[in-house]
Amino acid sequence: ALMKGLDYVFAAQYPNGGWPQNYPVERGYHEAITLNDDAMIHVLEVLHDLAEGDNHFAFADDALKQRAQAAFDQGIACIAAMQVQIDGQRTVWCAQHHPLTLEPVKARAKEPPSLSGGESANLVKFLMRSGPTTAEVVTIIDSALKWFDAHRLTGLRKTKNDQGKTDYIADPASTEVLWARFYDLQTAKPI
């Protein structure tokens, strides 16, 4: 069963290194390379652990480890290629990217093509933890961290409303640092 699952992961990977939200590929946003819900990160974590010979994968022979490493490396290359550049500067990522052009794309109605705070933060954490320590990956991480520093939101406090949902209220005394879920691709302002 585990080998069937791994074969599924290998088969689902696009030639550019990304993975669709669903496989076999369906039309619409399901075909997009999906960072939303950490989908691609979870796949890359499994491949990384397999390639590194993690105890959970003690059964893996060298050929399977090499196959996992190759898929992992393709995934990292895809992450590098998807990092949105604005005026020649690397920024962060969208929650979903087009499977061929790698451009940011819309998913569900509430998920516009945009720069994404949450998915990008988790992607940077993943790269810092498990990414190869190449000059390119260091540049990717540094660029994203600079973008986060320049786009943090201050003067707000996170609270719960009467229905138990999260609200944000203006509070100049707040020491919380927050980021928006989505930022406009042209203005980099919160949406």
Where is each model-derived feature located?
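Long, repeat-rich segments with strong aromatic
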Residues: 91-152, 159
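Alpha-helix capping at helix-to-loop junctions
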Residues: 11, 15, 49-52, 56
